[in-house]
Curated annotation (Swiss-Prot):
This is Mitochondrial import inner membrane translocase subunit TIM21. Residues 127-268 are mitochondrial intermembrane. The keyword Coiled coil does not apply. Coiled coil: none annotated. Residues 74-84 have a biased composition (Pro residues). Residues 66-89 are annotated as: Disordered. It comes from the Eukaryota.
Length: 268
C-alpha cells in the first residue's frame, strides 16, 4: 500500500489507492468529490506522475469553485415610494398665489404712496423757498423794502445799510421771540390769490414796529404788493407801498379781528 500526499485548503491529507502503478485505477477522495470531467484526461496528462496528476486535478477543482460577482451590470435600486397626494394641494396653490399677489400689490401701493408724499413735500419746500408766491420770499422782500425806506429808518432809528430783526408778533411774554409769521392766502373776486401777512420788525436800539402787507399772485411766477404798511408807536402809519385809493386795509387795534387786526376803511 502506497501513500499519496494531497494539498488542499485544509491542510495535508492522506489518500489511499489500491494500485498506485495504474493511473487508470479509481482514486478515492474522502473529502472532495471530483467531477467526471476531471477523470477524462488527455494522453499528456496520463503520462504525468501520479503525484503531479493528483495535484493538477486538485488545483483545477479549486480554481473552478471560485465565483466572482460584479455590480457593474446589477439592476438599479427601486425608486423611493411616492408621498401621499394632498387632496387640498390645488386649493393651497391657488391661495398661495393670491397671497403673493396681495403682498406685491400692497408693497407697490406703499412704495408709490411714499414716493408721492416725498414729491409733494419736496415741491412744497421748493415753492416756499424759491417761488415768488412763497411766504418766505414775500417776507424777505418786504423786510428789504422796509430797510431801504427813509421814513422807516427815522421811525426805528437805524442807519441805512443796517439790518432789522424780523419775527412773528410777540405776545405779552417778551422772552418769546421766534414766533412764526402770521399769514393767510385767500381768493378774491378778481380770481387771484391774495396773501395777507403780519409780522414785527426791530432795530438794534430796541425800537420796533408792526408790518402789515398784502400781495397779489398774478401767477406762480409773477406777484406784486398791494400795499406794505409800518406802524411804529408814537409815529403816524408809514406806507412803504401805498395802497390803491379807498382800499380796505387792516388797522392795528385791540386784536379782536383776524390775525390780530381790525378791518376798516382807510383813514388819512
Amino acid at each position: 500500500m502506497h501513500m499519496i500526499q494531497r494539498v488542499s485548503s485544509i491542510g495535508l491529507r492522506t489518500l489511499r489507492s489500491s494500485n498506485i502503478g495504474s493511473i487508470r485505477s479509481l482514486i478515492v477522495l474522502p473529502i472532495l468529490s471530483i467531477k467526471p470531467t476531471y477523470i477524462r484526461q488527455t494522453q499528456a496528462q496520463i503520462n504525468l506522475k501520479p503525484q503531479a496528476l493528483l495535484l493538477n486535478l486538485l488545483l483545477h477543482h479549486h480554481h473552478h469553485h471560485h465565483h466572482y460577482y460584479s455590480t457593474k451590470t446589477a439592476p438599479p435600486p427601486p425608486p423611493p415610494p411616492q408621498p401621499p397626494q394632498d387632496k387640498n394641494a390645488k386649493g393651497k396653490k391657488i391661495l398661495n398665489r393670491i397671497n403673493r399677489a396681495f403682498t406685491f400689490s400692497l408693497s407697490t401701493l406703499l412704495v408709490v404712496g411714499a414716493a408721492g408724499i416725498s414729491v409733494l413735500v419736496v415741491s412744497l419746500i421748493l415753492s416756499e423757498l424759491f417761488l415768488p408766491s412763497g411766504d418766505t420770499r414775500t417776507f424777505n422782500k418786504a423786510v428789504k423794502l422796509i430797510e431801504k425806506n427813509e421814513q422807516a429808518q427815522k421811525a426805528l432809528n437805524f442807519q441805512s445799510g443796517q439790518r432789522l430783526k424780523a419775527y412773528g408778533i410777540v405776545s405779552a411774554d417778551k422772552w418769546v421771540r421766534n414766533r412764526p409769521v402770521q399769514s393767510v392766502k385767500t381768493k378774491r373776486k378778481d380770481g387771484k390769490d391774495h396773501l395777507i401777512m403780519k409780522f414785527q420788525v426791530e432795530s438794534d436800539n430796541g425800537k420796533y414796529g408792526v408790518v402789515s402787507l398784502e400781495q397779489i399772485d398774478n401767477s406762480m411766477w409773477n406777484t406784486e404788493f398791494e400795499y406794505i404798511s409800518l406802524d411804529v408807536p408814537g409815529f403816524k402809519r408809514i406806507y412803504i407801498i401805498e395802497p390803491p385809493k379807498n382800499q380796505l386795509i387792516p388797522k392795528i387795534g385791540g386784536g379782536s379781528g383776524f390775525l390780530g387786526l381790525n378791518w376798516g376803511p382807510k383813514k388819512d
